[in-house]
């Protein structure tokens, strides 16, 4: 029987181990524990619980996207609300592995524009937001021009290599 406390204890016990992310296999084998992991990733608990929980979600969705599909709306809502950059990064990656849903579509689109355009946001988060924008362009080709105008502004400034690579990938339609 799983509860939030037992899952939190499991994460904390394994947090410092070199193969921490191998813990994702436990959740693949015990999907009844997933709601607690999702809740912990979106919680206000102290570090490292939310960040490490969200990090495990990345490994779970890459191994078996269907396991997290039922939580997509909850994860999207959590992404839109969290200020934790580590959790944001992981949730952006998780949602890239799932199909775009109608609920929160507009909010997610606006969020990704804000994250991508904000120079104070962590570079990885900006790149993953850009990858979401690339997906949105398929449904909304008119946003491509807006994305490209942000890119033009960014290219006139000093840029981290990871952001440059993300932009190059975006432009490779």
Predicted feature descriptions by range:
Residues 1-173:
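Alpha-helical scaffold domains
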């Amino acid at each position: 029987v799983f509860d939030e406390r037992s899952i939190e204890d499991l994460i904390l016990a394994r947090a410092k181990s070199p193969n921490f992310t191998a813990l994702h296999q436990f959740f693949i084998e015990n999907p009844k524990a997933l709601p607690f992991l999702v809740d912990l990733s979106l919680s206000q608990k102290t570090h490292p619980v939310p960040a490490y929980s969200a990090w495990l979600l990345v490994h779970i969705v890459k191994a078996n996207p269907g396991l997290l599909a039922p939580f997509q709306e909850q994860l999207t809502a959590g992404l839109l609300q969290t200020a934790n950059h580590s959790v944001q990064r992981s949730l952006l990656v998780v949602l890239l592995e799932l199909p775009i849903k109608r609920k929160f579509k507009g909010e997610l689109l606006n969020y990704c524009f804000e994250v991508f355009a904000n120079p104070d946001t962590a570079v990885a988060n900006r790149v993953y937001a850009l990858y979401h924008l690339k997906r949105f362009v398929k449904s909304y080709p008119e946003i491509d021009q807006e994305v490209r105008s942000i890119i033009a502004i960014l290219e006139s400034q000093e840029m981290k290599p990871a952001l440059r690579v993300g932009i190059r990938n975006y432009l490779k339609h």
